[in-house]
Amino acid sequence: MEGWRGAWYVPCLASHETLQELCRKENLRCKSIGITNKSLKSYEVEYLCDYKVEEGKEYYLVKWKGWPESSNTWEPQKNLKCPKLLENFLSDKDEYLSRMKEGRALKVRNSVKALKPAVADYIVKKAKQRIALQRWKEELNRKKNHKGMILVENTVDLEGPPIDFYYINEYKPAPGINVINGITTGCECSDCPAEKCCPKEAGFILAYNKQKKLKIQPGLPIYECNSFCRCGPDCPNRIVQKGTQYSLCIFRTNNGRGWGVKTLQKIKTNSFVMEYVGEVITSEEAERRGQFYDNQGNTYLFDLDYDSDEFTVDAARYGNVSHFVNHSCDPNLQVFNVFIDNLDLRLPRIALFSTRTIKAGEELTFDYQMKGSIDLTSDSADGLSSSRKRIRTVCKCGAVCCRGYLN
């Protein structure tokens, strides 16, 4: 599958452990899979796999970093210098016992002489998940081009990073779709906003107040200053283009809604939070994909119908943090169309702004059908394609005003 800007995404068929073993045999270094000069010459504990007591001594089965599982060894507890990994081991063990209702969570030491295979298996899976999520977090933060950090958290189940999802920062046009930035001129303002600033030239008012917070009603478009404008980066009409300013966390929900997104910082009312990006496809292609997504119960198609219903944004495989934002019938985010370097009315950028003050630790949500505060008769993004939905999806948002279904 062709990637972004001509790159190619080719899935690796070999496991992480197999690649490590091959690198060792060929004496190759590969930092991304933990094979470095240091790991080739020394042993570092990656995680603990099992526990036993022999002749009164405690032993832990150690998975060595950069070495295949076939090289695991039993090591006495006194030799281990990894308190955090030991803490993870004990915590995962207690968590499993508690969930399985095998009695109260017991302390390993002085309690048992060996773990049951099911317990050890869970501990290994949890350790592998923790490593996979850490790698995913690092990958997301390498690829994102905005200020805010992205964290990843799963304290609910053993689900790891999504398969076949590629992080992008802007629209990815599907083959045959040309997104041309037609801007050749910009405003001459030295102190925006002025009489002939970008929004006024387009026939609209400036979207932001002096505090750089949104002041327009849902349904109205946002026209920001562009790359040809005379004003500098501190211009109050450059907000969405600066990207997400908040640190966010992709987390596993505990009520069957899969992944979600929460903010790690307080967000004030009418603040820009993030863009909704994905693959830009035709409405015909969206119709075809929609049938497949219906059967899966997923909703990633966002119609762009500000001027026409020609294009749709599909964030199923290509997207950013917004891919993981859940629906709510009482959301704290609102969708707005934004035009910056591309004034093609068929291809507005989709920005999510806060509708109220959002506390640190609170989940971010938007209404997939955008009912409520938005004027549905106005020219606005149409939301995650309701017209294509043939199979009704039960809503689990839990809001008092919940409509019962996502579509």
From Swiss-Prot:
Zn(2+) 1 binds at residues 187, 189, 192, 197-198. Keywords: Cell cycle, Centromere, Chromatin regulator, Chromosome, Differentiation, Metal-binding, Methyltransferase, Nucleus, Repressor, S-adenosyl-L-methionine, Transcription, Transcription regulation, Transferase, Zinc. Its EC number is 2.1.1.355. Its main location: nucleus. It comes from the Eukaryota. The keyword Coiled coil does not apply. GO terms for molecular function: histone H3K9 methyltransferase activity; histone H3K9 trimethyltransferase activity; S-adenosyl-L-methionine binding; ubiquitin-like ligase-substrate adaptor activity; zinc ion binding. PANTHER family: HISTONE-LYSINE N-METHYLTRANSFERASE SUV39H (PTHR46223), HISTONE-LYSINE N-METHYLTRANSFERASE SUV39H2 (PTHR46223:SF2). S-adenosyl-L-methionine binds at residues 257-259, 300, 326-327. PROSITE patterns: CHROMO_1 (PS00598), CHROMO_2 (PS50013), POST_SET (PS50868), PRE_SET (PS50867), SAM_MT43_SUVAR39_3 (PS51579), SET (PS50280). Zn(2+) 2 binds at residues 187, 198, 225, 229. It catalyses: L-lysyl(9)-[histone H3] + 3 S-adenosyl-L-methionine = N(6),N(6),N(6)-trimethyl-L-lysyl(9)-[histone H3] + 3 S-adenosyl-L-homocysteine + 3 H(+). Although the SET domain contains the active site of enzymatic activity, both pre-SET and post-SET domains are required for methyltransferase activity. The SET domain also participates in stable binding to heterochromatin. In the pre-SET domain, Cys residues bind 3 zinc ions that are arranged in a triangular cluster; some of these Cys residues contribute to the binding of two zinc ions within the cluster. Belongs to the class V-like SAM-binding methyltransferase superfamily. Histone-lysine methyltransferase family. Suvar3-9 subfamily. Zn(2+) 4 binds at residues 329, 395, 397, 402. It is an enzyme of class 2 (transferase). Residues 185-243 form the Pre-SET domain. It comes from Gallus gallus (Chicken). Zn(2+) 3 binds at residues 192, 225, 231, 235. Histone methyltransferase that specifically trimethylates 'Lys-9' of histone H3 using monomethylated H3 'Lys-9' as substrate. H3 'Lys-9' trimethylation represents a specific tag for epigenetic transcriptional repression by recruiting HP1 (CBX1, CBX3 and/or CBX5) proteins to methylated histones. Mainly functions in heterochromatin regions, thereby playing a central role in the establishment of constitutive heterochromatin at pericentric and telomere regions. H3 'Lys-9' trimethylation is also required to direct DNA methylation at pericentric repeats. It is found in: Nucleus; Chromosome, Centromere. Residues 391-407 form the Post-SET domain. This is Histone-lysine N-methyltransferase SUV39H2. SUPFAM superfamilies: Chromo domain-like, SET domain. Residues 246-369 form the SET domain. Residues 43-101 form the Chromo domain.
